[in-house]
UniProtKB/Swiss-Prot annotation:
InterPro entries: HMG_CoA_synt_C_dom (IPR013746), HMG_CoA_synth_N (IPR013528), HMG_CoA_synthase_euk (IPR010122), Thiolase-like (IPR016039)
Residues the entry annotates as binding (3S)-3-hydroxy-3-methylglutaryl-CoA: 119, 161, 211, 249, 258, 325, 358
Protein name: Hydroxymethylglutaryl-CoA synthase A
GO MF: hydroxymethylglutaryl-CoA synthase activity
Pathway field: Metabolic intermediate biosynthesis; (R)-mevalonate biosynthesis; (R)-mevalonate from acetyl-CoA: step 2/3
The protein's Enzyme Commission number: 2.3.3.10
Its biological purpose: Condenses acetyl-CoA with acetoacetyl-CoA to form HMG-CoA, which is the substrate for HMG-CoA reductase.
Catalytic machinery residues: 85, 119, 249
Gene from which the chain derives: hgsA
Pfam families: HMG_CoA_synt_C, HMG_CoA_synt_N
EC top class, as a word: transferase
Keywords linked to the UniProt accession: Lipid biosynthesis, Lipid metabolism, Steroid biosynthesis, Steroid metabolism, Sterol biosynthesis, Sterol metabolism, Transferase
Organism domain of life: Eukaryota
Family: Belongs to the thiolase-like superfamily. HMG-CoA synthase family.
Length: 482
């Protein structure tokens, strides 16, 4: 078999819940100062789920929508891997649930499984897919990588940093968005900055200050190791000057702003005599670990990077601000935000990427956009879908999270949330039996059903219009469910 070239992303899709809470509303509800969440964290809205949605249903929606929008033949997929830390079952993987989308088409020969380490699982799943395609085990088929989570926190200062969403990516050779082979910097260590030892709760245990220290230390190491790989491959020094765009794992947007400054700080340490860094002279001989919480340095870096942040990073932040932290999906929702914002202007551009998962695992790597990607942007239709969401009052948001809390790990029940506000065609949890087996159904509208049927069967709009809508809807539901 011919060695595949230009491996990368052919299609990308995100599924997010149809409900969200505005951070400005949460500020009032929580009785905190105006701007604490919107300015202090840099967040706008936060997606959330009630008891009708879980990581299985979100992932089913992301993969099903990806396959539908990009006309993916289920039998063309040879690897399916999921990165998530939202664990429903200590044994059964999310990937096995997703197999329902393929087995009904006769494809049960699909490699891959779930990958778990906090927010890093999606990146590990992605790298596994790339390495599979580069190996002797590759069978010529494409891969789908799934990355996402439902991020919830108990009442308190961390709750506004939650979120929900799942990204699915179609990976294959000769892609418009390619990975720069051999360019990666990795850092991993054993630390308890964020972890979930209690299987009876969705809530994590978090040492916030330690986690920020770990995040910055990981950036320092990954960035410099990526720089060395770049210099080895291209024979020239690396700095942010070689980067057209930069995207980051985003627990909250303010940390992304600081992280971009952190990369420039490393450029300064690597080239302290550059006149652009004159205001940082006092930090020339200071240990990096002593600067993590230095407010004077932070302000200086913010001033130096202000313009570059606006052009290189801000275009990646839409979904992070609108959905909140999607954990494993965070980095790739940033990529999708960038595609939506810049479209074909990205052709020929390098996108430096930093992915972080507590515990910890992190890496820096890069994409290059080799071909026009406006067709991807049009199919995802991101901003229109965001605009169709339902804004929910903080009181209702709090009730929904309380409901999730009481029903976590519960058996023998039927979820009580309404499905009327869900996006048409969405999978949702319909019941959990006394053995803990979960059942799913789908929401439908006439237009959504007929639209999906038309795409699946490749029949004309005029033919659709000639059908009796009620009869057509009833008849095609059975086809779409097969």
């Amino acid at each position: 078999m011919t060695k595949p070239e230009n491996i990368g992303i052919h299609g990308i899709e995100v599924y997010f819940p149809s409900t969200y809470v505005a951070q400005e509303d949460l500020e009032k509800f929580d009785g905190v100062s105006q701007g604490k969440y919107t300015l202090g964290l840099g967040q706008t809205n936060m997606a959330f789920c009630g008891d009708r949605e879980d990581i299985y249903s979100l992932s089913l929606n992301a993969v099903n929508n990806l396959m539908d929008k990009f006309n993916v033949d289920p039998n063309s997929i040879g690897r399916l891997e999921v990165g998530t830390e939202t664990v429903i079952d200590k044994s059964k993987s999310v990937k096995t649930v997703l197999m329902d989308l393929f087995a009904k088409h006769g494809n049960t020969s699909i490699d891959g499984i779930d990958t778990i380490n906090a927010c890093y699982g999606g990146t590990s799943a992605l790298h596994n897919a790339l390495q599979w395609m580069e190996s002797s085990y590759w069978d010529g088929r494409n891969a789908i990588v799934v990355a996402g989570d439902i991020a919830v926190y108990e009442k308190g200062p961390a709750r506004p940093t939650g979120g929900a969403g799942v990204v699915a990516m179609l990976i294959g050779p000769n892609a418009p968005i390619t990975f720069e082979s051999g360019l990666r910097g990795v850092h991993m260590e054993n630390v308890y900055d964020f972890y979930k030892p209690d299987m009876d709760s969705e809530y994590p245990r978090v040492d916030g200050k330690l986690s920020i220290s770990c995040y910055f230390r990981a950036i320092d190491n990954c960035y410099n190791r990526y720089a060395k790989a770049f210099e080895k491959k291209y024979g020239k020094s690396f700095s942010l000057d070689q980067v057209d765009f930069a995207l980051f794992h985003s627990p909250y947007n303010k940390l992304v702003q600081k992280s971009f400054g952190r990369m420039l700080y490393n450029d300064f340490l690597n080239n302290p005599n550059d006149s652009r860094y004159a205001s940082l002279e006092a930090y020339k001989n200071v240990k990096p670990e002593d600067t993590y919480f230095d407010s004077v340095l932070e302000k200086a870096l913010s001033a130096i990077t202000k313009n570059d942040y606006a052009t290189k990073v801000a275009p990646t932040t839409l979904l992070a601000k609108q959905l909140g932290n999607t954990y494993c999906g965070s980095t790739y929702s940033g990529l999708l935000s960038l595609l939506d914002e810049k479209s074909n202007d990205l052709v020929g551009k390098r996108v430096l990427t930093f992915s972080y998962g507590s515990g910890l695992a992190a890496s820096a790597f890069s994409f290059k956009v080799e071909k026009p990607i406006n067709h991807i942007v049009e199919k995802v239709d991101l901003k229109n879908r965001l605009a169709k969401r339902v804004r929910v009052e903080p009181e209702i948001f709090t009730e929904k999270l309380s409901l999730r809390e009481t029903r976590h790990n519960l058996k023998n029940y039927v979820p009580s949330d309404e499905t009327t506000n869900m996006f048409p065609g969405s999978f949702y949890l319909s019941s959990v039996d006394n053995a803990g087996i979960r059942k799913y159904d789908r929401t439908y509208s006439t237009s959504a059903v007929l639209g999906a049927f038309q795409r699946r069967q490749q029949i004309s709009q005029s033919t659709i219009k000639s059908l009796n809508l009620f009869r057509a809807t009833k008849s095609v539901l059975s086809i779409l469910k097969k």
